[in-house]
Amino acid sequence: MAVCIPTWMLASQMITSGLSWIEALLIIGLANIVITLPMVLNGHPGVKYGIPFPVFGRAAFGIYGIHLPALVRALVACGWFGIQTWIGGLAIGAILATLWGIPYQSDINTFNVIGFALFWLISMYFVVAGTESIKWLEEFSAPVLILMGVLLIVWGTLSTGGMKEVLDQTTQLRQKSIRWETGNPDLLMLSPLVEADGLTPKASEFAIADSKENLVAATWQSIQSQVEQPANGPIWVQLRQKSPNGWHYSSPQFLDKPAAPNTNPTSVWIYILWFTAMVGFWATMSISISDITRLAKSQKAQIAGQFIGLPGTMMLFSFVGVFVTCASLLIFPDVMIAEDAPWDPVSVLARFSSPWVVIAAQCMMLVATLSTNIAANVIAPATAFSNLLPKWISYRTGGILTGIIGILICPWWLIHEISSILILISGLLGPVLGILMADYFWIRKTNLHLAGLYQTQGPYAYNAFGIHPAAWLALFLGVATALVGLWIPELRHAYDLSWFTGFITSAILYRIFFPLFNKKNTSKTY
């Protein structure tokens, strides 16, 4: 599951926020080492008792209380389903654009909307047909993406001056090419990308208009690095460059009125913020990892599998994304501003000149994305919805509900706010993991009453409602502590560290609350 398109794109926003490619990969690697440790620990009951997360979680949250964290985890998975479905839709959109002989664009347009709808329908077909119907595809998804990544690295290296020259291009991506000058709201900065010589701009003219439509009739002017432009309203800016076959145009860029003076966090907190976001990438899987580890042969096998398979794979596949994007800056003449850098493989492949190569490669993307999306983002939420109301919601109905929610979250917007989403997810799911681990290791010392996990009146019912008040209270307070920085600026750093804030707070509070709500049962080990 580490080999997927979101992993390919992980380093993109880190680099565009000012980090170097080495710093981005180090943060990804370190964050994955950190999150792998609790994933290994939380996978322990899966191996020992052979139980999935919705059953294991009953010990801490109650026989019915587990539905709350399961639903939170399910809603997050619905979001990821929507994002991956949008990516799959982009691949279909690229195929349609190629068949119609028009340039591919990754924004919201007719082809991409049609592609999204088609990919969603294909996904729902396999949900209704049952996950067994797609198992034959799951064996090919990771190898297909790995093979594609290797081929693109070879292509990028052979088509340019070598790996060093390619990676040097990351410096061009660390700020926007079209932006307001910091501290001067009337000064528009134009910094088109440059060729491999480091001197020749890839664009020579620019146009400014008050709307996207009016760019067609706008006057084109020679580019200077600084342009006096009164910032009295939103504007649209576009760059272009003459070529033997006509003009290459950048995508139109919208600039609103300049923001207030820069209040961005210091460099140290930028690293911490991205570190938290990268931990949040696996926040959902860290909670439900026992769904997978229950199939492991031993604790040693699940430990080795996670530590060997996760951090290194994430770093390597993220590196592929960085390298291929940087190579695209040198190879494709229509990539003339940093904002147009093709960070996702769909956009890279769509720029190849051979229609058959584009169609074949995008079909490979479809297969890989489809199998990964259903395995990682449909099974868990569909099961959670079904467990909540088993009389009314079957597994298939839960899968369709997952698909509907995946549309409602508007993934075409979320995909551009991935860092903010990951930090929010961290604040929601970190507390759940903290409670699970505090209960299993700190209180029960890994001892569970297996039969009791299936008894509505057993040791994990706690009360007539089947809800453990200690867990729910610790969860609410942990989430509130992690997310309070969203509304109170003075506590912003608590939000920047949302996974750690929520995890530690909820674990400690649960340990304090447990004996208070279980005075008659404090001596039991299960």
Predicted regions and their residues:
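C-terminal membrane-solvent junction of multi-pass transporters and transport-like membrane proteins
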Residues: 137, 144, 165-171, 435-512, ...
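Hydrophobic alpha-helical segments and their helix-loop junctions in multi-pass secondary transporters
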Residues: 85, 89-98, 146-174, 255-260, ...
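Membrane-water interface regions at transmembrane-helix termini and the short interhelical loops
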Residues: 13-18, 43-45, 60, 68, ...
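Membrane-embedded translocation segments of transport machinery
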Residues: 10-43, 66, 151-174, 258-406
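Membrane-interface loop-to-helix entry segments
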Residues: 118-119, 123-159, 167-173, 306-310, ...
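Transmembrane helix-loop boundary segments of multi-pass membrane transporters
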Residues: 15-30, 97-110, 132-141, 305, ...
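Helix-loop-helix connectors at the membrane interface of multi-pass transporters/channels
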Residues: 54, 58, 64, 88-111, ...
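Juxtamembrane transmembrane-helix boundary signature
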Residues: 27-59, 71-86, 324-328, 371, ...
